Curated annotation (Swiss-Prot):
GO terms for cellular component: cytosol
Protein name (database record): Translation initiation factor IF-1
Designated gene of the protein: infA
CDD domains from the UniProt entry: S1_IF1
PROSITE patterns in alphabetical order: S1_IF1_TYPE
Keywords assigned: Cytoplasm, Initiation factor, Protein biosynthesis, RNA-binding, rRNA-binding
Length: 72
């Protein structure tokens, strides 16, 4: 369930960091830090370096995000 004020971007995982955190390079060229959403953790969705992902961000902090979907 996403909020109406959240912003969605697509990007690719460029680096894996500790504690299910990833460095994601967005389509517009920016790099952010993103963590896995709870639903993806619950369903044991694995994310590896190079995967295409959909990231949800708030307009308040554009340096952090939440990975909500891994592209097939």
């Amino acid at each position: 369930m996403s909020n109406d004020d959240s912003i969605e971007f697509e990007g690719s995982v460029s680096e894996t960091l500790p504690n299910t955190t990833f460095r994601v390079k967005l389509e517009n060229g920016y790099e952010i830090i993103a963590h896995i959403s709870g639903r993806m953790r619950k369903n044991y969705i694995r994310i590896l370096t190079g995967d295409r992902v959909k990231v949800e961000m708030t307009p308040y902090d554009l340096t952090k995000g939440r990975i909500t979907y891994r592209m097939k």
